[in-house]
Amino acid sequence: MANIKSAKKRIKVTEKKTLRNKMIKSALKTAIKKFEVAVEANNKAEAATLYVEAARALDMSASKGVVHKNMAARKKSRLAAKLNAMA
């Protein structure tokens, strides 16, 4: 247990940021899964709109520092390839 005031504050801040990061990652995974379900169902119109949402979630999480920007770019590229392969 922390005794110093600044250490106590860091614990609180870390817990808050960890919760925020978990929330963002969870939303990101949900967006990607929704897109992949639409691709499996071969629903191109729905998949196109869900791709935009997934790409937005990836960009947002990368800009917030939750995931690495290269990881976000790689995932977006793979999702776009899946979308284009549906044609």
Swiss-Prot record:
UniProt name for this protein: Small ribosomal subunit protein bS20
Gene that specifies this protein: rpsT
Any GO BP annotation: translation
Role played: Binds directly to 16S ribosomal RNA.
Pfam entry (one): Ribosomal_S20p
Organism: Clostridium perfringens (strain SM101 / Type A)
Any one cellular-component term (Gene Ontology): small ribosomal subunit
Keyword Oxidoreductase: no
Gene Ontology molecular-function annotations: small ribosomal subunit rRNA binding; structural constituent of ribosome
Origin organism lineage: Bacteria, Bacillati, Bacillota, Clostridia, Eubacteriales
Similarity field: Belongs to the bacterial ribosomal protein bS20 family.
Keyword vocabulary terms for this entry: Ribonucleoprotein, Ribosomal protein, RNA-binding, rRNA-binding
Gene3D superfamilies assigned to the protein according to its UniProt record, in alphabetical order: Ribosomal protein S20 (1.20.58.110)
Keyword rRNA-binding: yes
